[in-house]
Amino acid sequence: MKDITLPPPTSASCLTGAISVNTEAVLSPMQHTSALHVRDFASLCSQNLKANVLLNSDDHEVPIHQKNPAAIMQNIDSNIKQMATDWGMSIEEVEVIIGREKGIVEPSCGVTANAIMKLFLDKDGFSYCFENEQTLSLEQLQERLSCMPECKSFVLRVNDGALGHAYIVDIPKGENSCRPAFLYQSDLGEGVTRKLRFEDWMTHKALTPILLDDICNYFSCMSQNKTDLEQIATLFDIDGNVKMLRKENIQYQKHDNFSFQLFEYDTDNIEKNIEIIKSLCS
């Protein structure tokens, strides 16, 4: 088994801005089934009210495939009616205020990240809950990645203090010397990067693989307070457009404030969950 080497990058590697996607070494966009399942989930959540409430549900003690979207919707409607009564407003006015116009709610980055983790990991007897899971530092993550089995797939949840952002890195099985990865995210546009719908990212960019080394290089650069806007734009902007970044919003005092959660996953489990969700939301 080959190990992936993750030494601290030199200042030159941090400042070149080069994110080198070797298309011969990584998966082509349509070969990674997990990415396709996440794309289908994002599309469903943008169009179907039941799926959207599953995406935004904060009851993480219940596995995503065991939730009752109809019951959740009924509770939401009851709460909105009560708010309308308490505030002396119409239901429509309340929905505008809380961002629930037409029922579809665009999730924050953290909500999206949590929902994707549940899609990957939830099964009978286990329900992913961000607050309850082990958190790794960058050094601990690097150690784990250095001995990651090539025959297994992993999902990584990232809390990125510098960007004020949370996102998912999907690491399918593959040779560690050129291990592919896929980045999943949404963004309300309140930080460094612009507003981004979950479905738009999954449709237009998420199926294009990056190298795991490249995202790890980003972690290392930011932890050394070496900010490369081209690197950030290449990874996180839907068009790779540096001009769309708001550099003034980078939290430099939090440049090393990364936390990670890393889990092995089974692609069959994702497929099972997405099929159940589609059935629940039909």
Swiss-Prot record:
EC numbers on record: 3.5.1.44
- Effect on the protein upon substituting residue 109 to A/S: Abolished ability to inhibit the host cell cycle. Abolished accumulation of the cyclin-dependent kinase inhibitors CDKN1A/p21 and CDKN1B/p27
Q: What class of enzyme is it?
A: hydrolase
A single Gene Ontology molecular function, please? protein-glutamine glutaminase activity
One GO term of the cellular component aspect? extracellular region
The record gives the effect of mutating residue 165 to N as: Abolished ability to inhibit the host cell cycle
**Positions of the catalytic residues:** 109, 165, 185
Task: Give all cystine bridges in this chain.
Answer: none
Q: Give the catalysed reaction(s), semicolon-separated.
A: L-glutaminyl-[protein] + H2O = L-glutamyl-[protein] + NH4(+)
| GO BP annotation list | symbiont-mediated perturbation of host cell cycle progression
Q: Where is this region: Translocation domain (TD)?
A: 1-16
> Any idea where this protein resides?
Secreted; Host nucleus
Where is this protein primarily located?
A: secreted
User: Which effect does the record note for changing residue 111 to A?
Assistant: No effect; does not affect ability to mediate deamidation of host NEDD8
Q: Which UniProt keywords apply?
A: Host nucleus, Hydrolase, Plasmid, Secreted, Toxin, Virulence
Could you give the domain comment from the record?
The translocation domain (TD) is necessary and sufficient to mediate translocation into the host cells.
Describe the family membership recorded for this protein in Swiss-Prot or TrEMBL.
Answer: Belongs to the Cif family.
What functional role does this protein have?
A: Protein-glutamine deamidase effector that inhibits the host cell cycle and other key cellular processes such as the actin network and programmed-cell death. Acts by mediating the side chain deamidation of 'Gln-40' of host NEDD8, converting it to glutamate, thereby abolishing the activity of cullin-RING-based E3 ubiquitin-protein ligase complexes (CRL complexes). Inactivation of CRL complexes prevents ubiquitination and subsequent degradation of the cyclin-dependent kinase inhibitors CDKN1A/p21 and CDKN1B/p27, leading to G1 and G2 cell cycle arrests in host cells.
The protein in question is named Protein-glutamine deamidase Cif
Q: What species is this protein from?
A: Escherichia coli
Give the taxonomic lineage as stored in the record.
Bacteria, Pseudomonadati, Pseudomonadota, Gammaproteobacteria, Enterobacterales
